[in-house]
Structures are given as structure tokens and as C-alpha cells.
Amino acid sequence: MPKLIIDLNATKENAINELNDFIDNRLHSYESLRNYDLGEDNHQNVSLLSPYIRHRLITEQEVISAALNKFPLPKIEKFIQEVLWRTYWKGWLELRPRVWDDYKDNILINNDKKQLLEKVLSYETDINCFNIWTKELIETNYLHNHARMWYASIWIHTLKLPWEAGANLFLKHLLDGDPASNTLSWRWVAGIQTKNKSYCLLYTSDAADDVRC
């Protein structure tokens, strides 16, 4: 069962404390370390603030203001950009409600794919890293951002499952699941968000035992 935000001891005070801890101790190395997924319960190289932002215990503006009070923009520009992407995607989707409606209309899996979906949800595909990510997603309600892209790429381009069903799985389980960021990220991996551009992980069976593929 997906966790609730309350499971994080999530209060405004707690969110501010987490924000300050990140700024004081980890923000300085965010840009150089953010791309590495070190595995379950080892995500201190990213902010881990997304659940608090998603549930509005803190806002993007509060995060940016606090960060800029500690560091000049050139030192933390990548982090600021990542925060601003959240607001950009929200605005983009609000202006295109049909995109959201189309996603909701296509989240069901066809009968010919249901057996494969069962393997996915029971961690029994032939792709070890994919199984590990599915387990982490369902049991911890979190995935590193790059793991989310890799996962979506395997889901769409290797397993040939519909992107809408994958986006729905994420939105159901992610504690920080944001309708706009989640939907549009899956569309981008599928190659329908940005014309003539998709995200395709070059997965090979030789990488099957590597958690990061």
C-alpha cells in the first residue's frame, strides 16, 4: 500500500528542518552527485524534498529563496533549474487539459499485456535492475529521478507496455507523485512530449545484474 505523507513525520517544521539540512550539508555537491542512483535508502546525494513540495508543506519559492540565501546562483544553478521545472510543467499541463484527459483515458492495460504486467508487479521480469526498481517503488514509494527515467525507458521501449499505465503506476505509488511532472516525463521518454526526441536506455542482458543497468 502506498505510504502517506504523514508517514514521514511531515509537518511544516519538519519540512523546513529537512530543507535547512540539505542546504547546509548537501546542496554544495548536488550538481556533481545528483545523477548517481546508489540504491534503496541511499539517496542523500539529492534533496529528498519532493514529497514536502508535492504536498505543499513547503513551496518551490521557499526552497529557492532559502537556497539563494546561502549560495550565489552560479554555485547552485542546476538545483534551481530542477526546482523550476516543477512549476513549468504545472503551467504547461494546465494550458493543455486535453493531454491529462488523454492520459486518464488510456491507463488500462489490454488483455494481451496483463500477464507481462503481473510479472512486473511481482518482480519477475528477466531484467534484474527493473525488478529491483519496481520493488523499491512499491515498498518505499520513492525512486531516484534517473532511475525513474531508466525505468520508464525499459517499460516503454523494451517491454512495450503503454506509457500511460507506467505513469499511472508511478502516480499511485510515489509519495512525491506530481500529476504534471510525472505525466510529462513519461511522455518525454515515450517520444511524444518533445518532437523527434525520446529517451531510450541502451539495455543489454549483460547489464541485468547491475542495479543501475
Place the predicted regions along the sequence by residue.
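Residues lining hydrophobic/aromatic ligand-binding pockets adjacent to catalytic sites
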Residues: 1-205
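Single conserved hydrophobic/aromatic residue that forms the stacking wall/gate
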Residues: 206-213
